[in-house]
Amino acid sequence: MIVYLAHDLKTPLTSVIGYLNLLVDEPQITPELRARYTGIALEKAERLEELINEFFDITRFNLTTLVLEPERTNLTRMLEQLASEFAPVLAEHGLTIRSTLAQGTEILCDRDKLSRVFDNLLRNAVNYSYPDSEILLTLEKLEQAVKIVVQNHGRTIPPEKLSHIFEQFFRVDVSRASATGGSGLGLAIAREIVELHGGQICAESADETITFMVVLPVQGL
């Protein structure tokens, strides 16, 4: 585990140091390049922060019993807010998001932890989508549960890799995951949180489409 931690933390940190050194070593750099290097360094630093947060989470899950703090939550509003927060990232990748959300959907859940699940699924969709494609986000009411789907268009995940996708540190495409700063922990954390809510999460991939489905009980905590 320590080897994984060292490698995944070092990748974005090396980029941050490299671009900051360029800014220090080249005082005559053009304003355009300065802005570009600063932007890249900031992006890598933010990825490093995400990795550190993920490592804290996974350590806590391994060493202690995670306690949920359930409250009545408007799931529709949560997903709308998350989709809105992703607007800058989507624009950067030439992506769009199409939301079809059942209005006024409320469930009993730990709002912060569940928000982390859908943030992770949306971030995963962004990182593994073809440029200029569309991400689909849907929320459907079932009889005693709700179903949330996050679907994107990207390289089909082979069945032998799909079966391991929720395992800690597993990465479908190591080269692409390294480029996006992914740790291979996000989906493992998502599964842990969903199952603690009494729900289920699964993934499907075919015909260059990747689909994640989460089913949660309306009551049940």
Task: Please give the residue ranges for each predicted region.
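Conserved catalytic submotifs in the C-terminal HATPase_c
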Residues: E69-R72, A91, T96-E106, L142
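A conserved beta-strand-to-alpha-helix junction within the catalytic ATP-binding
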Residues: E69-S84
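Conserved glycine-rich
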Residues: G198-G199
